[in-house]
């Protein structure tokens, strides 16, 4: 691009001035941005005063935001320092951890964390978006849009966001919308207005994102497609010529970058995209590295949100690609975007929600603010002569920061991360066929969580069973659950499993896993119980509406205390946030908290000097905090790893690093037992630990009741598995049966046949403990070893085991038994004659167990 003459003149004038270098950069970058946004090739084309006014206002706005953000950050730092020194006296490490990922300690505000705020913000944004589509009667149209409709909707979004021309302004007209279908216009309008409201919300919280059409979908990039750009575009790597001076990781990386860049450049608005870029190739390589590393998903603070302005050179804001038209962007999206337009929309919402939760709790500069809090607490302890070794470094907390800012979803080495994700994905769909059967222990955990809140243990378990027996809720109660913040896994799987949870997976692997977990019934099981848990809690809280906080039962008081719900907040909730269903039952209604009065909000905050807009922000924050209680407790009732457990399991390591991948394989299938120990066991330990709400008896009783019920449900799960395999239940009179039931109920049952196969060599037991990947490798090595030694039978058996245990979908509980009886037992007998009789003898000896029907050894003699 040729350098603009006007820009050159201004730069020369600034060089001769006494203005500081940093200031000169800000002025020039602002002028370039304003000219690009106004599509000006020369300032002479318009009144120079208009440009000057715009430049001045933008620089003033940024200064104001920087000042306000600094004040808010200081308030956050001081508030947390006081909270930790007061509430976590003697365990300051736990107090610092609680800021990010919550704590099980029974202390005021212990679970009022960044991670809960993020989860709640995402869930409520999803709910608000879905309800907006439903209100217009176009939710199904939006959900089921084909490619042609997506393109039209996307184009209409751009037209709705267009600024009126001078002629249109004089005539009082709005920009023209070419689409005539009113339903499509409604879909586009909801998307545009939601995106714009979300942008304004983030700006109100400290960001500085300029108005741009479709902001929320422009986060959309599929790291897998971007990294394999040549293949995605149907190009051969050998035919791509690259700049020899390009600083990529290797020649293939450079060729894929070149293919991606050449395609993207075709639709880019160069003047606007590269307004502040000194070198276009460097700019585009920076963008490419960010996309391949999945760094666009991170929540690093106000100035780093996608699209946020920062005029200082080298600033950390994410680079923006501006396209000439909506069709140009959509053409790019079809090749390199996150699936459909709908997925791009939800993906943008999730990233925005993570940013909102982060900023609300840790301000505009999260890591810097956390370090100020830590150092401030450390300083006070040193002055008191206390030991500060536990909090002397940021390193122990980094693993949790990497979870909440999204670093663990970024990639260091793409190839290693991709192959690791594929390996673990294959493991999931070939070894978790019986996961829903193993999940019967969820019922015990469900009951223990409700008991923790003051409800009835066995009654809550019965309620959960009734929910499963109903198969699905009525539309009315589904709407109530959605309003509380419930998100069905099936709705968000496409996006969440690819960018937000666990491994980053390609579209194909995501679809395979989504189908598999539907077929093994785990999606239905989890959604049903989580939905019922949220409805049950909302109904339980509503039943207490006539009681003041100090009149509630002690367990519920303790629960509200750890989420910072005091008497003033509870009075507002019980007065304002109630709704009655058609069957007469009452529920907490989160959406009603939008309508609380300014006076009530002032009482909650303890101040009356806030503006209308600031009060509205606080009302939304309060609504999200109440929803956060229900969402957070629902993952304790239907256990899944929270941010704290994820940090411990991953140690904050990136995918694509040697240790990150090793830990990924080591931790596969261990999420449930780890969460069980940390979240359920930790919950009860919170009462045993020293503190203002210590109740050792309650903690011991809670652990005991949970353990006994888990063992009982473990036996039920084992028995169901045996029945599905055509076996009798194990003899309950044997001690070994109850040890196995304890292991099953405690989470080891998720391994299915991985750990408890009848056929395995003793050397592979250790491999099973360290993960299914190691088990498969052990079987392959055993087969090779036996083959070298000439032991064909053993080699064949190990090889068959390695293959049969890694066939996707073959492990589905209703397929596995049929496969075994049709051909599996025949193969086993062929590979190792007499093996079926040995299995039957072992079953009788170890478990006092027989087959229900004809013994496999009678009808299967091998081929």
What are these regions (language model features)?
Residues 2-197, 201-207, 211-231:
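Low-complexity, small/polar and acidic-rich linker and loop segments
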Residues 147-176, 378-419:
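Acidic/polar, low-complexity linker and loop regions
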Residues 176-180, 287-291, 296, 302-330, ...:
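Short linear interaction motifs
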Residues 181-199, 393-405, 423-426, 484, ...:
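Short amphipathic alpha-helical coiled-coil/interface segments
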Residues 214, 220, 262, 269-274, ...:
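Domain-level detector for long, ordered catalytic/regulatory cores in large eukaryotic signaling
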Residues 345-385:
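Low-complexity, highly charged intrinsically disordered N-terminal segments
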Residues 436-505, 662-863:
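Small-residue-rich, membrane-active alpha-helical segments
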Residues 581-582, 589-673:
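Glycine-centered flexible beta-alpha turn that most often forms the glycine-rich phosphate-binding loop
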